[in-house]
Amino acid sequence: MVVCFLWLLLPYAATTLSASVPGCVPSGALLPRPTELSQSQNIKDATERLSRSLDDAVSGRIKAGWDIANTSFSVSIVSPNGGDPRTGVLWEYHHLAEKNINGTKHLDGDSQYLIGSVSKIFSDLLLLKSDVDLQDPITKYLPQLKNASSPIDWDNISLLSLSEHLSGIPANTIGALQFYFLEPLYRALGFPPLNKTDYPPCGIADLNKGCTPEELLTELVNSHPVSEPYERPVYSQLSFTLFSLALANDTGKDYAQMLEEQVIRPLNLRNTGVSPGEDKRAVIPNVEQQGWGADYGYNAPGGGLYSSLNDLSTLVTKILDYSILQNPQATKKWLQPRSATSSLNTLVGQPWEILRTSGMTPKYPHMIDIYGKSGGAPGYISQINVIDQYGVGVVLSTAGPLDSRAAYIINEAVLSAILPAVEDEARKQAGMYVGEYTSQKVDNEDATDYAPIKLKTVIDNGTGIKLESLSRNDSDILEGIRKVWSATLSTVGQLASEMRVYPTGLERLATNDKSLVEQDWRINFDLIPNFNEQASDLPGLGKLEALCTSWQTVDWLYYAGVPMDRIVFIVDKEAGRVVGVEIPFLRSGIIQKLN
């Protein structure tokens, strides 16, 4: 017990005497994911406004911010909770630019785009579905990299680190982003003159042929690391080439075959594969340098796939319903950060680009984690966003000029439209938990043993569901919890004046009636911050941000073996209503909800 207690106190010793700022809420869903989104008026209103805005932009009635005549795009909002049964699409919008004279003449959800580094999602998925041990060193599968004189300790580079951008190896394959035709420019800029033999023997545009896999591995032995493994995230295309070559050596199958068997066929994807795709279905930008039809070779795992809006929507939907891997827990593990950047708002996953933002729901501001992946190929930009908290996603592909900002503008516009709407819908549907619950005396219960329990819940402008009051035999139980905390854990800090409950995602059948489920919720023990600068005259105080510690106080208070923060709602899923609540630490049994 002492060890656990010190574990909680140590962060305070290192930072402040305080705990978290009021409102230090749990991560993840703050209310249950809303369902039947296709029937939601909030969603309908938001997407209708969004469609009108995009109509105005592509027609020139408002400033779009990109070359309308030369930029085609497809965008969708998806969810497993009410979206199309196959793709999950709730809403979609397509624009075929008038100058896109090649490729498809009918742009729809099955039209093909290059998706650039969104390919990394497919490759990481392939790795996660494989039978290899992700802790294995890359040299187990690519022994050519074993070389004592190599600046990189390849024996220390695991498959897992490669998939998480944490290996510290070079960003690109041999010759990538090296352009021999720029030699005159380099000299004019003062760079030293070089001979052709100074360049790598393969992979240099306009100088020599592309590297074979064997030549690539030979040259990599001489490459220098960018950092130590796990020192910091370093974005790497090369990493995906290497672990895909490792999988190919392990299975005896090439990347395209593995992708077909493990990802494309199981997900029933109809317009996804290794470039090149089908010209007649392609969205081909009318620009001089565009990548449609290119053969990406061993670079395909990091950025050489094509796909369609429907296929990417299916991918995101299967991630959101947790069915894309062997079990829901594996998918939830995938949707976790692996490292941090210097920005408080940017984390790195496998291979997710995670944006943490609190400005997308201005009426009810709170932190939202957007698990995104962007991708670019010459003339193409794609973006997928997975918002697990709400069970929704956004998919976007564009084809146009190399300097187009269309993807960035449209992506933000769509997120700004859908997230407030789905927040409103989540609050509306969570209204079924709101109300008054009162216990009833059972027929055979002695009158002297009966102690009425009353609970009142509300939804206000804060997060989760607020416990307005909880009493037993007219005793204020919420105040009682605060006093118990103060008596036993006051060193940690004092509980905030409000108590709110949040869903845990745990539910089970309540009875043999399959429509009734028990949903576990937990009270968030949020703490009032103490400010060092108010307690001491020592210099330098008040500069450290308060530490968010409510995640450390879950499941702490117990009453005779039962957690005091656990509340169980009894939900009739077929009827869409809450029929009662159980407060286990009060030994309440089921307390009926008053109509």
Swiss-Prot record:
<feature type="glycosylation site" description="N-linked (GlcNAc...) asparagine">
    <location>
        <position position="473"/>
    </location>
</feature>
<feature type="signal peptide">
    <location>
        <begin position="1"/>
        <end position="18"/>
    </location>
</feature>
<feature type="glycosylation site" description="N-linked (GlcNAc...) asparagine">
    <location>
        <position position="195"/>
    </location>
</feature>
<feature type="active site" description="Proton acceptor">
    <location>
        <position position="235"/>
    </location>
</feature>
<dbReference type="GO" id="GO:0005576">
    <property type="term" value="C:extracellular region"/>
</dbReference>
<comment type="similarity">
    <text>Belongs to the beta-lactamase family.</text>
</comment>
<keyword id="KW-0378">Hydrolase</keyword>
<feature type="glycosylation site" description="N-linked (GlcNAc...) asparagine">
    <location>
        <position position="461"/>
    </location>
</feature>
<keyword id="KW-0732">Signal</keyword>
<keyword id="KW-0964">Secreted</keyword>
<feature type="active site" description="Acyl-ester intermediate">
    <location>
        <position position="117"/>
    </location>
</feature>
<dbReference type="Pfam" id="PF00144">
    <property type="entry name" value="Beta-lactamase"/>
</dbReference>
<feature type="glycosylation site" description="N-linked (GlcNAc...) asparagine">
    <location>
        <position position="102"/>
    </location>
</feature>
<dbReference type="InterPro" id="IPR051478">
    <property type="entry name" value="Beta-lactamase-like_AB/R"/>
</dbReference>
<feature type="glycosylation site" description="N-linked (GlcNAc...) asparagine">
    <location>
        <position position="156"/>
    </location>
</feature>
<dbReference type="GO" id="GO:0008800">
    <property type="term" value="F:beta-lactamase activity"/>
</dbReference>
<feature type="glycosylation site" description="N-linked (GlcNAc...) asparagine">
    <location>
        <position position="70"/>
    </location>
</feature>
<keyword id="KW-0325">Glycoprotein</keyword>
<feature type="glycosylation site" description="N-linked (GlcNAc...) asparagine">
    <location>
        <position position="249"/>
    </location>
</feature>
<dbReference type="InterPro" id="IPR001466">
    <property type="entry name" value="Beta-lactam-related"/>
</dbReference>
<protein>
    <recommendedName>
        <fullName>Beta-lactamase-like protein ARB_00930</fullName>
        <ecNumber>3.5.2.6</ecNumber>
    </recommendedName>
</protein>
<dbReference type="InterPro" id="IPR012338">
    <property type="entry name" value="Beta-lactam/transpept-like"/>
</dbReference>
<feature type="glycosylation site" description="N-linked (GlcNAc...) asparagine">
    <location>
        <position position="147"/>
    </location>
</feature>
